[in-house]
Amino acid sequence: MQEFSLWCDFIERDFLENDFLKLINKGAICGATSNPSLFCEAITKSAFYQDEIAKLKGKKAKEIYETLALKDILQASSALMPLYEKNPNNGYISLEIDPFLEDDAIKSIDEAKRLFKTLNRPNVMIKVPASTSGFEVISALAQASIPINVTLVFSPKIAGEIAQILAKEAQKRAVISVFVSRFDKEIDPLVPKNLQAQSGIINATECYYQISQHANKLISTLFASTGVKSNSLAKDYYIKALCFKNSINTAPLEALNAYLLDPNTEYQTPLKIAEIEAFKKELKTHNIDLENTAQKLLKEGLIAFKQSFEKLLKSF
């Protein structure tokens, strides 16, 4: 399935030096993503950073973070570079800008350009959240020929608006990261069993349709947050359900490994628009509106990344 790509949503130094290379070499993945929460988890809990942190003592916390994070990003970039050179639609690693800059477009643009210039790798994507100021940042980076990963996309309306900007302005590869499982975690406790474990996939499918209206060879939907939040679901539930043409799925290791044991051999056919609308109508009988939920989840996602980043900086 050449039009579906699997990426790894995990970063940690020991992993990059070992299992990450194995996954690439056996053709299991062709890209990777990182975020502030993943870096916080890796750097604060892994022993592989401690010697370097000790040597950096006395420097500012953000400087320590960037030294560690950029080293990991460069290592991932090098490992993925042969894939990028073979096919420039694949082989990317993503790095997110400082989450505390999300409401300041000018500072976000400056930081994104600085990080991209410092890394100096064509297969690095700069992650920009789909916040209010994010639109200006996305436009500026697209015009500057910087590969972009627009993250924390929950709303189909926002997904379509972002795709429209990128279709006009993107000169390099761009992905729109549609978050999936958080919808089910939010909505499932509020609905009967026959409606559970569906909201995330249905909302993501509507986002996919919105993006597809503007997608070209540079722009793809990337399904993110595809690890299950419920023990009742198969670990690879969201990967299998969203195996669409011209899409990418970035998955945590547990979901990734489960999927690789029994991967899809054919693309999934997305639900029809009429089926999506019927489901949304049924949700409304339970006083649930997916667009309102999307706005809530975006706010929570922005806060969560700030909290993780703050926790990481304080650990230094």
UniProtKB/Swiss-Prot annotation:
Protein keywords: Cytoplasm, Pentose shunt, Schiff base, Transferase
Transmembrane segments: none
Gene Ontology process terms (BP): carbohydrate metabolic process; pentose-phosphate shunt
Pathway: Carbohydrate degradation; pentose phosphate pathway; D-glyceraldehyde 3-phosphate and beta-D-fructose 6-phosphate from D-ribose 5-phosphate and D-xylulose 5-phosphate (non-oxidative stage): step 2/3
Keyword Nucleotide-binding: no
Subcellular location, record wording: Cytoplasm
Principal subcellular localisation of the protein: cytoplasm
Annotated EC: 2.2.1.2
The protein's role, per its UniProt record: Transaldolase is important for the balance of metabolites in the pentose-phosphate pathway.
Record's protein name: Transaldolase
Species the sequence originates in: Helicobacter pylori (strain P12)
